[in-house]
UniProtKB/Swiss-Prot annotation:
Part of the signal recognition particle protein translocation system, which is composed of SRP and FtsY. Archaeal SRP consists of a 7S RNA molecule of 300 nucleotides and two protein subunits: SRP54 and SRP19. GO terms for molecular function: 7S RNA binding. It is found in: Cytoplasm. Transmembrane segments: none annotated. One of its GO terms (biological process) is SRP-dependent cotranslational protein targeting to membrane, signal sequence recognition. Disulfide bonds: none annotated. NCBIfam families: PRK00754.1. Involved in targeting and insertion of nascent membrane proteins into the cytoplasmic membrane. Binds directly to 7S RNA and mediates binding of the 54 kDa subunit of the SRP. Pfam families: SRP19. This is Signal recognition particle 19 kDa protein.
């Protein structure tokens, strides 16, 4: 990511929206809004549907050693609002 894009994109790790994770394990949104075990593929697809221009990076979440991958998305509103939107879109995709 170049310096001129700094501040215009946010990082989304699956743990941020995972209802199976506690707040101390990295969940950022409320349990009621989170989804169980979101995959990188689902996050990318949901972000595409929302027009957030996702970009995959093979980095692991510092708090958790298992699982690799994070997604950078356009910051079109606040971080928590975007995370809730992505989780909601994943819920819709799962039916």
């Amino acid at each position: 990511m170049s310096r001129d894009n700094k501040g215009r994109r946010i990082v989304v790790y699956p743990a941020y929206i995972d209802s199976k994770k506690s707040r101390s394990e990295g969940r950022k949104i409320s349990l009621g809004k989170a989804v169980p075990n979101p995959s990188i593929k689902e996050i990318i697809e949901a972000s595409e549907r929302l027009g957030l221009n996702p970009l995959y990076e093979e980095k692991h979440y510092p708090r958790l050693k298992e699982g690799k991958g994070r997604v950078l998305v356009d910051k079109k509103s606040g971080k928590l609002e975007i995370l809730r939107m992505i989780a909601d879109e994943i819920r819709k995709m799962r039916g």
